């Protein structure tokens, strides 16, 4: 049985969801919402794996570490780093823009690093650091929101 060709870029066409009204903007149609969710999910996972890679590298190259723990830390660092790049590339393919994916990964990496630093090393972050995280979160909220255009198209002149 032959499969029907889809639209370019892996986008979901309106014919795939006939119950979606055509007047909905593209970012609110059924397939676009699903793609956005998976884009954000993959970017959050990429940030968490990046923080885990950094934490395992810090454990592996500590001053009082045995050779076996050092080798284990390097293996964990390499595997989590490859998982981070895999999830980041998948997040890029699902996201609406590379800026959204990059900022989402950065935010996830910062929060995951703070959590792992607290759990593994007892590190606490200062108020200024949390203020920076809040500003990044505000920026993320702004770029993930998609407002409808407020301008109306001009009527075409007939010659």
From Swiss-Prot:
One of its GO terms (cellular component) is membrane. It is found in: Membrane. The chain crosses the membrane at residues 37-57, 59-79, 100-120, 124-144. It comes from the Eukaryota. InterPro entries: TMEM42. It is a multi-pass membrane protein. Keywords: Membrane, Transmembrane, Transmembrane helix. Its main location: membrane. This is Transmembrane protein 42. It comes from Homo sapiens (Human). The gene is TMEM42.
């Amino acid at each position: 049985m032959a499969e029907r060709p889809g639209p370019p870029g892996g986008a979901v066409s309106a014919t795939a969801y006939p119950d979606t009204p055509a007047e909905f903007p593209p970012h609110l149609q059924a397939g676009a919402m699903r793609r956005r969710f998976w884009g954000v999910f993959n970017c959050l996972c990429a940030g968490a794996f990046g923080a885990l890679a950094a934490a395992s590298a810090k454990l592996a190259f500590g001053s009082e570490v045995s050779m076996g723990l050092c080798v284990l830390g390097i293996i964990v660092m390499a595997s989590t780093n490859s998982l981070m790049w895999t999830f980041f590339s998948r997040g890029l393919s699902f996201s609406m823009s590379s800026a959204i994916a990059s900022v989402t990964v950065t935010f996830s990496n910062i929060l995951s690093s703070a959590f792992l630093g607290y759990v593994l090393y007892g590190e606490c972050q200062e108020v200024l650091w949390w203020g920076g995280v809040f500003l990044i979160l505000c920026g993320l909220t702004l770029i993930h929101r998609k407002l409808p255009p407020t301008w109306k198209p001009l009527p075409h002149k007939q010659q």
